[in-house]
Amino acid sequence: MQSTNDIRRSFLDYFTGAGHAEIASAPLVPYNDPTLMFVNAGMVPFKNVFTGLETPPAPTATSSQKCVRAGGKHNDLDNVGYTARHHTFFEMLGNFSFGDYFKEQAIEHAWTLLTREWGIDAARLTATVYHTDDEAYDFWRKIAGLPEERIIRIATKDNFWAMGDDGPCGPCSEIFFDHGDHIFGGPPGSPEEDGDRFVEVWNLVFMQHEQTGGEITGDLPNKNIDTGMGLERIAAVMQGVHDNYDTDTFKELIGASEGLTGVKAEGDQAASHRVIADHLRSTSFLIADGVLPSSEGRGYVLRRIMRRAMRHAHLLGASEPLMHRLVPALVTEMGQAYPELTRGQALIEETLEREEARFRQTLEKGLRLLDDATGDMSEGDTLDGETAFKLYDTYGFPYDLTEDALRPRGIAVDETGFASAMQRQKDAARAAWKGSGQAADSEVWFDIAEREGATEFTGYTSTSGEGRVVALVKNGKEVDSASAGDEVVILTNQTPFYGESGGQTGDAGTMSTPDGVKVEVTDTGKPLGRLHTHQAKIQSGTVLKGDTLHLDVDVDRRDRVRANHSATHLVHAALRNRLGEHVTQKGSLVAEDRLRFDFSHPKPLSEDDIAAIEAEVNEEIRANETVTTRLMSPDDAVDAGALALFGEKYGEEVRVLSMGRRSKEGRNYSVELCGGTHVRATGDIQLFRIISESAVSSGVRRIEALTGDAARQWLVRREEALKSAASALRTNPEEVAERVAALLDERKALEKELADARKQLALGGGGSQVAQSQDETIGDVTFSGQVINGLNPKDLRGLLDEAKQRMGSGIAAICAVNEGKAAFAAAVTDDLTDRYNAVDLVRAGVEVLGGKGGGGRPDMAQGGGPDGLKAEAALNAVRERLASAAA
């Protein structure tokens, strides 16, 4: 029996043996395609090739492409675990022809591989063709010798492919495998076609037409082939099983899940193990390709998949995080074919464990709420949308997780009600996917790229040069000219201006002509990853399409930018040396005045970590080693030890930047794939200083730093501030910390003395005789009333207790004023509580102070108000209350 890994390899080997170029799988995050959340088909990386926007990598190609279908139009999430062939992650084997061979050879390749190379029984294969595609029908008869009843004409869109209403399109031919009459189902096109007996294993797309507005308008000048074969499906066929989850890779993953949970994949528990095995693959590959769980976009879909798997782990009795413990089994099965799994294993495990630990805190509460809400429900009932939304909003249960939890009981969820509740909650956590910011104006860039091709970048070796104006864009539309005062985007056939990409900001500078045209360039973009767009303002003259301009990059600004960019490479290496190889770049900003570097790490950096990283980078700067650049293939670069960024799409040739001193093994301190601009030697960076370290999101940290003169000025400002502080403290800068500590101790002691003095003042200062002299008689009652500024309100009751003890019989009231506000308290000795209530007296004073209420006991009460200026009036209110009672 061939393993799934063997089948993948034999497919690729067959087509490379037939002259196809083997193309590595693209990352799951689509490159420069805001219309897709994830790569969901083998042809996605070649979309721009098929539409003519990119040059083919070779005349013919083959690949095994990672795919995810768990969001948007193509969403298999709900069915995963309950059917034989639904997956969130799958591999699409494919062969492609870009204007080379067409139908006959595509069918011949498919038939040869299936029946001769792999030995699949030809009698169990059936082909479908589009109902008008006589050519494909005849080739199946000629090449495969299939009888007429096993070449089925299909008139539906299942056998006609189109990228959209406009662009290339063409008929399809699908190959089905018959799993046997012991399984329900009929051949394609029959009433029983939805059964599981006949399973599609390969789809051949013949791109031969051009369409506009959904109508075919003609034939393509170059006809293309796009085929797709699900690896999991063909593995089931070749391993003699009907269910994808019974193939070797899934059996290993399910076996690992059984081992950790102690629960066999039987009966009702089988679906849970399948969900865990499938979702382990999709979550691990997404994390390896740079996606992290979040509350929106791709990260939210990843979190949904994670939480669905975690709920099923809970159903199997797992009391601790489980998913991260299954990652080694996945790496063993698939790490050789996809090295990014091995490289990202630490981050994958860490992310899964942290997310599961967090979700478990609310999972049980949410499930209890769900059980309470549905306890009296029966099969066929519907859970209201409000409760489903509460589960989402309070406990982090996505709608589909609630659906999944109720599915075994046959209880539906009110989707409309859920949507209404979501709409009403304006600050709902989940944000709709809106694609990238380029989507709105991308059409004009596609038009220009198709007409002019990519901009030639000359800025690696020069900061000035000539460029011919190939397009002028104003307000999203092409124009023929731009005059003084106009703000316009200028595109030239070549430019030394770096376009913003890879975290590095675009260049600024000037354009000019000998006859007086002057243009200020404020920024440079890079839409589609191919064009360099100069954001410009015409200072004088008129720029016409076709003009030749002299282009000058602002060299001082470029030098500051490239110093910061090179510093990010050094800090990346230093972080990995200090913290471990799990550290990977998660984002960066390289501007002229600062740099920002985001990286994967589960906890804050200590002061020692920051100091060590900063020292290590500065040591490499002082070494002043030459920065070298080499061009090589991506595979050779990675083999040479270069760090490649997850999610980046690399062409046939990449730039490998090496900087810093060499190790004993001959490897430079930092070796990375990078298309940015860099210093000539590390000493050009001059100085590196970290100014902050913070969290970006769960598992991602951020360093902000300065280099060169910006770092020097920052240190000078700190030194000046220290000198100013030393002068004010009348000490040396070296003794500022010691002097400040002494002053703080002194202040603390003085504050204590002041508090004690205020208490003594409240008690009469000079003793009981002085205190008695402050007493007054109202009717037959002795009254002591005081206003004390700066007294802590918590000392009021203690002072009143002492006043009661001193007086023996009487009433005392104190108003403590702090920062304009007043605290008011009153006390009545026990012999007078039958005549006077402290609560009533306090309320009288509090009302004057602008407050409300006041509470306590008949012998002691307290309140307060915002108007401390009326403190004496508040005491007078008490005096009036006492005088009124005595009258």
Swiss-Prot record:
Q: Which Gene3D superfamilies does the protein's record reference?
A: 2.40.30.130, 3.10.310.40, 3.30.54.20, 6.10.250.550, Bira Bifunctional Protein, Domain 2, Threonyl-trna Synthetase, Chain A, domain 2
Keywords, alphabetical: Aminoacyl-tRNA synthetase, ATP-binding, Cytoplasm, Ligase, Metal-binding, Nucleotide-binding, Protein biosynthesis, RNA-binding, tRNA-binding, Zinc
Q: Which SMART domains match?
A: tRNA_SAD
Residue sites binding Zn(2+) per the record: H565, H569, C674, H678
Q: In the record, what terms sit under GO molecular function?
A: alanine-tRNA ligase activity; aminoacyl-tRNA deacylase activity; ATP binding; tRNA binding; zinc ion binding
Q: According to the record, how does the cofactor bind? A: Binds 1 zinc ion per subunit.
Entry GO CC: cytosol
Q: What is its EC number?
A: 6.1.1.7
Q: Name one GO biological process term.
A: alanyl-tRNA aminoacylation
InterPro entries for this protein: aa-tRNA-synth_II/BPL/LPL (IPR045864), Ala-tRNA-lgiase_IIc (IPR002318), Ala-tRNA-ligase_IIc_anticod-bd (IPR018162), Ala-tRNA-synth_IIc_core (IPR018165), Ala-tRNA-synth_IIc_N (IPR018164), Ala-tRNA_ligase (IPR050058), Ala_tRNA_ligase_euk/bac (IPR023033), DHHA1_dom (IPR003156)
Question: Which SUPFAM superfamilies does the entry mention?
Answer: Class II aaRS and biotin synthetases, Putative anticodon-binding domain of alanyl-tRNA synthetase (AlaRS), ThrRS/AlaRS common domain, Translation proteins
What family is it from?
Belongs to the class-II aminoacyl-tRNA synthetase family.
Protein name per Swiss-Prot or TrEMBL:
Alanine--tRNA ligase
Q: Which gene encodes it?
A: alaS
